[in-house]
Amino acid sequence: MLDAATYTPRLKAAYAETIRAAMKEEFGYKNDMMIPRLDKIVLNIGAGAEAVKDSKKAKSAQDDLSAIAGQRAVITKAKKSIAGFRVREDMPLGAKVTLRGDRMYEFLDRLITIAMPRIRDFRGVKGSAFDGRGNYALGLKEHIVFPEINFDKVDEVWGMDIIICTTAASDAEAKALLKHFNMPFNS
């Protein structure tokens, strides 16, 4: 059994032992605090039209996202009414969760080593999906690629957004950091 007091996630240990030194050498940082690190990972499931018709769909998305993240997700609600979409203010539309610390490193490890290889016809993620400030966004068409989701008990297959926020000053630094974490970029 793992001792919670001494356990360190695999990617967090790799960052401390090898990735920091490699990044410092690659970019010539003068100060250790200049070295980019992961800040947070935000997961989002938008239930969309299904949630408008049935409010239980947002609760289902929340339960699935909580299982994937390992911490409770919050239900996202509409900020304002839009008559064309039949959406009313405060209507539940999906779920989101923000991961930091050890849970963030554990999720990134599961995403890269378990979930991405399970995606059909997977050829890597786009290397151009950075926002100009060192953050990376990717989308999955099916949330069932995560082992925490029991395929037989899923009533709806959701797409999900994953935003990886770093402290990097540029996209090149953030891409190098994620490459050191073995993110499978296709370009």
From Swiss-Prot:
InterPro entries: Ribosomal_uL5 (IPR002132), Ribosomal_uL5_bac-type (IPR020930), Ribosomal_uL5_C (IPR031309), Ribosomal_uL5_CS (IPR020929), Ribosomal_uL5_dom_sf (IPR022803), Ribosomal_uL5_N (IPR031310). It holds the Pfam family Ribosomal_L5. The keyword Ribonucleoprotein applies. Keywords: Ribonucleoprotein, Ribosomal protein, RNA-binding, rRNA-binding, tRNA-binding. The keyword Hydrolase does not apply. One of its GO terms (biological process) is translation. One of its GO terms (molecular function) is tRNA binding. GO terms for cellular component: ribonucleoprotein complex; ribosome. Gene3D superfamilies: 3.30.1440.10. This is one of the proteins that bind and probably mediate the attachment of the 5S RNA into the large ribosomal subunit, where it forms part of the central protuberance. In the 70S ribosome it contacts protein S13 of the 30S subunit (bridge B1b), connecting the 2 subunits; this bridge is implicated in subunit movement. Contacts the P site tRNA; the 5S rRNA and some of its associated proteins might help stabilize positioning of ribosome-bound tRNAs. Belongs to the universal ribosomal protein uL5 family. Part of the 50S ribosomal subunit; part of the 5S rRNA/L5/L18/L25 subcomplex. Contacts the 5S rRNA and the P site tRNA. Forms a bridge to the 30S subunit in the 70S ribosome. This is Large ribosomal subunit protein uL5.
